[in-house]
UniProtKB/Swiss-Prot annotation:
Entry GO terms, CC: extracellular region
Signal sequence extent: 1-22
GO biological-process terms attached to the record: defense response to bacterium; defense response to fungus; killing of cells of another organism
Record-given protein name: Dermaseptin-B1
Keywords from the UniProt entry: Amidation, Amphibian defense peptide, Antibiotic, Antimicrobial, Cleavage on pair of basic residues, Fungicide, Secreted, Signal
Keyword Lipoprotein annotated: no
Transmembrane segments: none
Subcellular location: Secreted
Pfam families: DD_K, FSAP_sig_propep
Propeptide residue span(s): 23-42, 76-78
Residue numbers bearing the Glutamine amide modification: Q75
Tissue: Expressed by the skin glands.
Amino acid sequence: MDILKKSLFLVLFLGLVSLSICEEEKRENEDEEKQDDEQSEMKRAMWKDVLKKIGTVALHAGKAALGAVADTISQGEQ
């Protein structure tokens, strides 16, 4: 009976240790995923700002080019 108790205790102890290790790894993986999500959101926000600025610059450049063409045409008509 004593051997049975010791072996049962050993099995339970090893089970708890492996469960603890698995939970720790799970927490680490969740933390890594959370960090990856935060980095992805930061990159998305950065690209959104960059593309907005590029669009604004392109809009102003297009307006300036159209103005120059209109000036050239009006000077040619005179």
